[in-house]
Regions:
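Alpha-helical cap/lid subdomain in secreted, periplasmic
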Residues: 2-3, 43, 68-182
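Charged, often glycine-rich, active-site loop that binds/positions anionic groups
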Residues: 55-74
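General N-terminal targeting signals
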Residues: 26, 33, 62-65, 101, ...
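Catalytic metal-binding/acid-base residues of hydrolase active sites
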Residues: 14-15, 53, 94, 142
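Serine-esterase "nucleophile elbow" of acetyl-processing enzymes
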Residues: 1-52, 60-61, 76-81, 87, ...
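A short acidic, helix-capping loop that chelates divalent metal ions and anchors anionic groups
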Residues: 16-19, 56-60, 95-99, 147
């Protein structure tokens, strides 16, 4: 039998499966699990879900702190889960929050930076004394819902301007991934 493919998902609440209903629960059928179920028809999969609600690409939140800064924790997470065959990064949504005041290029560059960290961390199949690195892919987060522009929404101020910026993310990220060879 062939070895299982070890796939690590590095994401935020969108990958964690957060239900935006105020209860803090998660979807039973999250996309990482559905992906692994689909891929298991082709090969054996060990899914590693490293998904944390409120995680940013490379920003420490002024309220939540540095534990949610994806850049600060990525290398240790990769090394702790080795061997890893493939890393899927889906971050950037929380960088759209108004208090971070980021433009789309800052967010895209931060996402590409996470891919570069992954490509330089020896967490692949070769073991502790190998330079093998996992493959990496970036999944662009979905556009923010128009509810972010509804002043009656209790979190509208937190997400002010996020909808418009999120519409630019896919195209800008695709161009950056092409330039970076991702």
């Amino acid at each position: 039998m062939t070895e299982n493919k070890r796939i690590l998902i590095y994401g935020d609440s969108n990958s964690w499966g957060y239900l935006d209903d105020g209860n803090g629960e998660r979807f039973q059928y999250r996309w990482p699990i559905e992906m692994a179920n689909y891929l298991s028809n082709i090969f054996s999969v060990d899914l590693i879900e490293e998904c944390l609600p409120a995680r940013t690409t490379n920003l420490s939140d002024p309220v939540l702190g540095s534990s949610f800064n994806g850049e600060l924790t990525l290398e240790a997470i990769l090394l702790s889960h080795q061997p890893i065959d493939h890393v899927l990064i889906m971050l950037g949504t929380n960088d759209l929050k108004a208090h971070f005041d980021r433009n789309i290029n800052d967010i895209v560059n931060a996402i590409i930076g996470l891919a570069k960290i992954t490509r330089s961390t020896p967490a692949g199949r070769g073991g502790w004394f190998s330079d093998d690195v996992p493959d990496v892919s970036i999944i662009c987060p979905l556009a923010i819902g128009q509810r972010a522009n509804d002043p009656s929404w209790d979190r509208a101020e937190e997400w002010s301007g996020a909808y418009e910026k999120s519409l630019l993310l896919a195209h800008t990220l695709q161009k950056a991934c092409n330039l970076a060879g991702i």
